[in-house]
């Protein structure tokens, strides 16, 4: 026993020295309080608090009362442990930020999808999963005697489901309305002639009348104070062809020679009509007596006919057309257009 006691002294001394060394390396309470438990250091190290135990080499039969005060203090002492790595607080904070940002993005995407669905559905269309509060009756406790009412209520709740098919029917109706009319009826072409076609037909008719020499719808009659004149026997519409002023088509040089010869005989009269065509002066000489009626139409400043040039294959023809609607029985008149002093002195009726 005495030998065992002697051997325990060096072991106790060694344990006390080890506890003192650990206590010297551990920070004091002031440092722990100032930094705070679990607070990260500035160099990126995390600090953890823990408890250190010094297992003694003493015999287990010895009680704690025989331990030195230094051993008891160090057995429950708290100290800080350094852990190399990134701060855990920063890692947790970044994870929370990513989670929050993901939730915000998902919520914004859901809101945009809902807006698009609302725009397609229209302002008056109900949501597909939304039940109308007016159609849904308030829930009341039902008893065994109210089973018929419960069945009727269930049928009433099923009615809105039938109403959901109405938009489909409307959509089908719209597609039917958008069909073309030509799908049901053939395309009809207008039988009315265009303005160009009418003008072409009228021109061909005038060509035939000029070339054939037909003069219809008029006759020769004696007019008081004028002599012979032409009377309409049918109605002429405005712009309609009446008659051609037919005669010899000559140039200005030949016309002057003939006019000098006609002036020698006062009973001959003047039946020469001058006009310009393609910047050149021509004359229609109708002095020679023929059965054509155009040369016998008298003069008037307020006539119902007017002259017009009509070419056939490059050859000009002088024709008379109705300047207004002409009734049957009216005398055909047109303005000669000669206002020279010599002509008025020779033919005073040119004033009227």
Curated annotation (Swiss-Prot):
It comes from Bos taurus (Bovine). S-adenosyl-L-methionine binds at residues 226-228, 271, 298-299. The lineage of its organism: Eukaryota, Metazoa, Chordata, Craniata, Vertebrata. It comes from the Eukaryota. Belongs to the class V-like SAM-binding methyltransferase superfamily. Histone-lysine methyltransferase family. PR/SET subfamily. This is N-lysine methyltransferase KMT5A. Coiled coil: none annotated. The gene is KMT5A. It is an enzyme of class 2 (transferase). Pfam families: SET.
